[in-house]
Amino acid sequence: MKTTRREFLKMAGALAALPPAGFAWAGQAQPKSASLAAAWRGPNAGDTYFAGVLSADWEGKKITISRAAALPTRPHGLTPEADGSLLVTGVRPGAWLMRIERDGKVAQQVDLAGESSDARLNGHVVVSPRGDVIYTTETDMKTGRGLIGVRDRQSLKKLAEWQSHGLEPHQLLVDAAGHLMIANGGIPRTAADKKYDLHRMDASLVRLDGQSGRLLRRWTLDDPRLSLRHLAWSHWAKGDKTFLGVAMQAEHDDPSARAAAPILAVLDSDELILPARAGDGAGYAGDIAPAYNGGFALSSNQVGLAQLWHPAMPEKLTRIVELQEAYALTGWEGPNPGGGVLVSTALGLVRWHPSAKPALLPWPEKMAVDNHWVLLDEA
């Protein structure tokens, strides 16, 4: 199955609606390939999940599976390490954490059932700036408290637990000062991962000291039914600003309120704002990535859509990809000066870029790529 000419024209024509950014359009050398850390399964819900590396050949117009390791259950977050290995976590409530080596072999696996804590993983990991520890988002399954696990980088053994100062911490990143930025999703969940008592939602964005876990700052939104989930940094050179984008999911009881809900929050300096009140018609952003040099791309898999936000047009979301199951996102530099994004869809990998032609590469076999992927390198 191939995408239509109309859909490609939408991807290319989206630039007309974006603010001018001074891009050069011709005569630039384009990368020939890209490697992505990804997770996937076969076409059926019961198929085995794998994590590994997908290689995109732009000139050959194909994707190959460079390495793959079978996983015990569905994964969620993927974190590349400097030596080429890959940290993979089980989907919430995650019972395992795994390291996969460059050759695709499983080097380590931690089963949380064997730890003394009652915590389970919430899906994301980040490596400390010093490289000695990793931080994991977790939930105490007895109390429901949000936790940050501090684990030895080499052994993956838990060294300490910090409070996340909220419910259901999901993704976390490190800021320029080495502190942790954590999206507390705020949704009460049972041990079987069922949502309940949504009137008690307590979503927040917090900053913790990266050495001690001390709470430095906590931000909340006026609407308590907006769950803060995924994070990305993006630098806007023209405005000399770095933004933290937060992809959100609406949990309102009223379907019309969910459909009308915004899907993006932005930490601008020290203020958490909702710049674009328009959303996606579903109130569900699945992933976020830096794009267009200072902006963010957001995916909405429920409606088959990826949209672009930029600080030069802060009230607007521009559609850049409209394909079924538009989901995993990662920033892609591409030709100078960068600003592109790679999007997983039901049909294959979609490439969007301000100065490169859009492209769609079909999957190498029948497969369903999971929620997130990460660009490793391009050549």
PLM feature spans:
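Asp-box/WD-like beta-propeller blade repeats and closely related beta-sheet repeat scaffolds
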Residues: 112-124, 136-175
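Repeated scaffold domains used in trafficking and secretory/extracellular systems
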Residues: 73-79, 119-124, 167-173, 226-232, ...
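Surface loop/turn motifs at the tips and blade-to-blade linkers of beta-strand repeat domains
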Residues: 68-72, 112-117, 162-165, 219-224, ...
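Blade-loop segments of beta-propeller domains
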Residues: 68-81, 85-127
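Beta-propeller blade signature
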Residues: 51-54, 148-152, 200-210, 260-268
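Short, conserved, GDST-rich strand-edge loop motifs in beta-rich repeat architectures
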Residues: 40-43, 137-140, 182-201, 246-259
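N-terminal export signals
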Residues: 1-2, 7-28
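Residue-level detector of Asp-centered blade-edge/turn motifs that repeat once per structural unit
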Residues: 81-83, 129-130, 175-177, 235-240, ...
